[in-house]
Amino acid sequence: MKNLTDSFVYLGHWPSAGSFGFNTDILATNPINLSVVFGVLIFFGKGVLNDLLDNRKQRILNTIRNSEELREGAIQQLENARIRLRKVETEADQFRVNGYSEIEREKLNLINSTYRTLKQLENYKNETILFEQQRTINQVRERVFQQALQGAIGTLNSCLSNELHLRTINANIGMFGTMKEITD
């Protein structure tokens, strides 16, 4: 590396009279040297610059192409997400409507069932009241009959003597005998 640097230093110190060389003093540079340097730079630099620009252009185009592909993919994903969202919203609306109608149906069924149960309870209550009334009426009749029978027995016992009692029995036996003859 040192040899290479030394050779450039020696080139810069060549004598300027009658020879061709590099002038390292920028203020003393002549237009011919500048044009040669610019010509070499343009000749060799043009290809390098074109390659750099082409590479840069290709990278930019690839980046744009990739961005477009990603954009299209993102748009497709967004569209798919919107479709799924609409589908889910539709299903949610159906569940909501079905749920409300199911709730209303259950509510009506519950109301009807409760009404029938209340009606049955009312019928049972009325039947129980009627049964209790009949039982009470029968008990009252039985007591009235027992009291009337006891009163009649008491009255008969106090009014009837043994002789009257025997006559009544004989008359009744006679009536039964007559009835038996008629039925035969």
Swiss-Prot record:
Keyword set, alphabetical order: ATP synthesis, CF(0), Chloroplast, Hydrogen ion transport, Ion transport, Membrane, Plastid, Thylakoid, Transmembrane, Transmembrane helix, Transport
Entries under Pfam families matching the protein: ATP-synt_B
A GO CC annotation given for this chain: proton-transporting ATP synthase complex
Main subcellular localisation: plastid
Localization per Swiss-Prot or TrEMBL: Plastid, Chloroplast thylakoid membrane
Transmembrane segments: 27-49
Subunit structure comment from the entry: F-type ATPases have 2 components, F(1) - the catalytic core - and F(0) - the membrane proton channel. F(1) has five subunits: alpha(3), beta(3), gamma(1), delta(1), epsilon(1). F(0) has four main subunits: a(1), b(1), b'(1) and c(10-14). The alpha and beta chains form an alternating ring which encloses part of the gamma chain. F(1) is attached to F(0) by a central stalk formed by the gamma and epsilon chains, while a peripheral stalk is formed by the delta, b and b' chains.
Sequence similarity: Belongs to the ATPase B chain family.
Further comment found in the protein's record: In plastids the F-type ATPase is also known as CF(1)CF(0).
Name of the protein this chain belongs to: ATP synthase subunit b, chloroplastic
Organism per entry: Arabis hirsuta
Gene name of the record: atpF
